[in-house]
Design a protein with these regions (language model features):
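Short internal beta-strands
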Residues: 1-6, 83-84, 263, 280
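Left-handed beta-helix
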Residues: 138-308
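Conserved N-terminal catalytic core of the sugar/cofactor nucleotidyltransferase
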Residues: 1-57, 61, 66-68, 75, ...
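Conserved core of the sugar-phosphate nucleotidyltransferase
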Residues: 62-143
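Conserved beta-strand segments of alpha/beta enzyme cores
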Residues: 25-27, 105, 162-164
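Alpha-helix/helix-capping structural signal
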Residues: 7, 130-131, 179
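Active-site glycine-centered loops adjacent to acidic/histidine catalytic or metal-binding residues
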Residues: 59, 86, 177
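Hydrophobic packing residues within well-ordered alpha-helices of enzyme cores
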Residues: 12-16, 136, 184
Length: 308
């Protein structure tokens, strides 16, 4: 199931559809207002039934998949399991405090503490059982008016239930800001051409640390510096310089531009003498005209036409 909020839920449905393209069957559940993660979980009670389940927050990107963690939880009698990751700024996250005498035990969990003595962030992946629904029913809204997942986990522990934790290996990124999305893009692209490369579709080729989609045409009068990904049915015309750290979506046309450390989503057209850096260009956008040689940084929404 995918839980949809009140910000453009139709865009999520438009992208994933019924899930057939991804080999799954998707049920959509609506959370009309942002009342907290625990509130969103409670909306899934009927969908979950008596099964164990995983809650995965959509703005999380992990280097390692969840297979090993899922097997560990499924074969156990745990009431919950959380994943932890060491961070430099714990005040931005829910933070777990482990027992000094027994590091396998969690003492408590606090949401966005101001002065934390722990650097173990609770990442947005929660392994739960239906016991959590009864816990959520007894929660009170936090100071920001939401039913917090950290409060639910703390109450679950307070009632004597068993919560385990595991530490994430590899990187983890919370993509809550444009800067975070750009950084996550760099982390993903760094896997190209390595043993740890993310899976790509069968009709996509990989050359060194550059991935090029099918039916994409690249002019000889252009240059690509990896790591980079170029989608299907793209046209990279003359005078284009791409990379490093560039992701280009399907159906894009680029001409006479330079793009570095940026994400350009599908069906975009850039035919401007512009030097883009650290930018995110949403799908079906168009940039044309002429700019100076200085570096430009843009954050453009869908179907934007920017004339320079």
């Amino acid at each position: 199931a995918i839980i949809l909020g009140d910000i453009y839920p139709e865009k999520v449905r438009e992208y994933y559809g019924n899930g057939e393209e991804f080999g799954v069957n998707i049920t959509y559940i609506y959370q009309e207002k942002p009342k907290g993660i625990s509130h969103a979980i409670r909306l899934c009670k009927e969908f979950v039934g008596n099964d164990k389940f995983i809650v995965y927050l959509g703005d999380n990107v992990l280097r390692k998949n969840l297979t090993d963690y899922t097997k560990k939880f499924s074969s156990s009698d745990l009431d919950a399991m959380i994943l932890l990751c060491e961070v430099d700024n714990p005040s931005k996250f829910g933070v777990a405090y482990v027992d000094k005498d027994d590091s396998s035990k969690i003492k408590n969990i606090i949401e966005k503490p101001k002065n934390s003595t722990s650097n173990l962030a609770v990442i947005g992946v929660y392994f739960l059982t239906p016991k959590i629904f009864g816990i959520i029913d007894n929660l009170k809204p936090s100071s920001r008016g939401e039913l917090e997942i950290t409060d639910a986990l703390q109450l679950l522990m307070d009632k004597g239930n068993t919560i385990a934790h595991d530490t994430v290996t590899g990187w983890w990124k919370d993509t809550g800001t444009p800067e975070d999305i750009i950084h996550a893009n760099r982390l993903v692209l760094d896997s190209i051409g390595t043993e740890d490369q993310f899976l790509v579709e069968k009709d996509i080729s990989t050359k060194d640390n550059i991935i090029i989609g099918s039916n994409t045409k690249i002019s000889q009068d252009s240059s690509i510096i990896g790591p980079a990904i170029i989608g299907k049915n793209c046209k990279i015309e003359s005078g284009v310089r791409l990379g490093p750290y560039v992701s280009i979506g399907d159906g894009c046309t680029l001409e006479n531009c330079s793009v570095e450390n940026s994400i350009i989503m599908e069906n975009c057209k850039i035919d401007a003498q512009v030097n883009l850096v650290s930018s995110i260009i949403a799908r079906s956008s168009h940039i044309d005209g002429n700019a100076n040689s200085k570096k430009s940084q843009f954050l453009l929404g869908e179907r934007t036409h920017l004339k320079l």
